[in-house]
């Protein structure tokens, strides 16, 4: 075991347990660092708090992405691949560890789909709770203390060597990737691959929402992002219409219109969803609003009104046939077994009415699909 090495960082000591291979990696911004870690208390028993090997999956962080526990980036960038080192970190670096640990444990229990990588968002919300849900972490949070981290560096990937998830991108990269995702979504929609298209739109929306949180609400840049988000949400709703998820369309479009009542396309898309679930009055009201805001859409509105009329007629015919079938079944007469010795005084009962004729088979024409 090498002697303790100072990293020129206050409150950090490093001891190399096993030397690594090769030169020190090039830890540029955006590099993905994959590693195993074990966290221990500085007590006599060196009590283990967390161990990624027990989870069975290593952890990774992205250099430069403001990881929750910033000191880990300092520790990792001092290591070579396959190196195992022990780091003693003073309280000034470990105060946030209980919150990080809670996230990691929940992920390990399958409560978070992002697995072992940890996003930077939502950190402030954690302080709103009086308990973290784990007794040992509550204790650490109440009484912060130095901790020991044993880390094995497994792999370092340059930004170009792996597919980066959108949440890993910088703000500038997010703005650049949004039009790419938008265009890819449009291309997939035209090919009829609506599930894939909706995923692209969702990914772009998440990027923009993340950027929007950094802006002051209702100011120029925030409104610019809001406009882009609404456009993508309406494209996403077009996919939902194709997937026949009409009530989700109603939810998204109504939310947009609550905040931005002048968006014509939102009324138009919502009208189509209303028509699909036979909300005749609501569909007509939305189409009327489209005409008020955009008279040039008169032709499209007339087409949707015709489709709505056809759908309502089909619905009425379907209901009429259903009622007729129910009445027909209710009127069906089935004679009971005659008594063995009918009473002498009983008169001959008149013959019962014959059962109603079954309704003729009617082939219902499916509703014409709404145009994109």
UniProtKB/Swiss-Prot annotation:
It comes from the Eukaryota. TPR repeats lie at residues 178-211, 230-263, 264-297. SUPFAM superfamilies: FKBP-like, TPR-like. Keywords: Cytoplasm, Nucleus, Repeat, TPR repeat. Its main location: cytoplasm. One of its GO terms (molecular function) is peptidyl-prolyl cis-trans isomerase activity. GO terms for cellular component: cytoplasm; nucleus. Residues 325-372 are annotated as: Disordered. It holds the Pfam family PPIase_AIP. The keyword Cytoplasm applies. Disulfide bonds: none annotated. InterPro entries: AIP/AIPL1/TTC9, PPIase_AIP, PPIase_dom_sf, TPR-like_helical_dom_sf, TPR_rpt. Residues 53-145 form the PPIase FKBP-type domain. It is found in: Cytoplasm; Nucleus. PROSITE patterns: TPR_REGION. The keyword Cytoplasm applies. May be important in protein trafficking and/or protein folding and stabilization. Interacts with NUB1. This is Aryl-hydrocarbon-interacting protein-like 1. The lineage of its organism: Eukaryota, Metazoa, Chordata, Craniata, Vertebrata.
């Amino acid at each position: 075991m090498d002697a303790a090495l100072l990293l020129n960082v206050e409150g950090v000591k490093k001891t190399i347990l096993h030397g690594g291979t090769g030169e020190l990696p090039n830890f540029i911004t955006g590099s993905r660092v994959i590693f195993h870690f074990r966290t221990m208390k500085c007590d006599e028993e060196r009590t283990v708090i967390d161990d990624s090997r027990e989870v069975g999956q290593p952890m990774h962080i992205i250099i430069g992405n403001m990881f929750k526990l910033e000191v880990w980036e300092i520790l990792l960038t001092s290591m070579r691949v396959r190196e195992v080192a022990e780091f003693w970190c003073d309280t000034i670096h470990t105060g946030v560890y209980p919150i990080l640990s809670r996230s990691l444990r929940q992920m390990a229990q399958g409560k978070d789909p992002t697995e072992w990588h940890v996003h930077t968002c939502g950190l402030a919300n954690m302080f709103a709770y009086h308990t973290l849900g784990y007794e040992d972490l509550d204790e650490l949070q109440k009484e912060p203390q130095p901790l020991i981290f044993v880390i094995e560096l497994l792999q370092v990937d340059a930004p170009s060597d792996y597919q980066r998830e959108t949440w890993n991108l910088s703000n500038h990269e997010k703005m650049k990737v949004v039009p790419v995702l938008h265009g890819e979504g449009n291309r997939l929609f035209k090919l009829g691959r609506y599930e894939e298209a909706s995923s692209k739109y969702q990914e772009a929306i998440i990027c923009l929402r993340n950027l929007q949180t950094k802006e002051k609400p209702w100011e120029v840049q925030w409104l610019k992002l809001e406009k882009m988000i609404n456009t993508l949400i309406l494209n996403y709703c077009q996919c939902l219409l194709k997937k026949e998820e009409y009530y989700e369309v109603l939810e998204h479009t109504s939310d947009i219109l609550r905040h931005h009542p002048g968006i014509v396309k939102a009324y138009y898309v919502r009208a189509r969803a209303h028509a699909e679930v036979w909300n005749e009055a609501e569909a007509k009201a939305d189409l009327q609003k489209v005409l008020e805001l955009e008279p040039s859409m008169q032709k499209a509105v007339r087409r949707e009104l015709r489709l709505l009329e056809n759908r309502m007629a089909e619905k009425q015919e379907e209901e009429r046939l259903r009622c007729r079938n129910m009445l027909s079944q209710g009127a069906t007469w089935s004679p009971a077994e005659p008594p063995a010795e009918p009473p002498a005084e009983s008169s001959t009962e008149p013959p019962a009415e014959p059962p109603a004729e079954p309704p003729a088979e009617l082939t219902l024409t499916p509703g014409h699909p709404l145009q994109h």
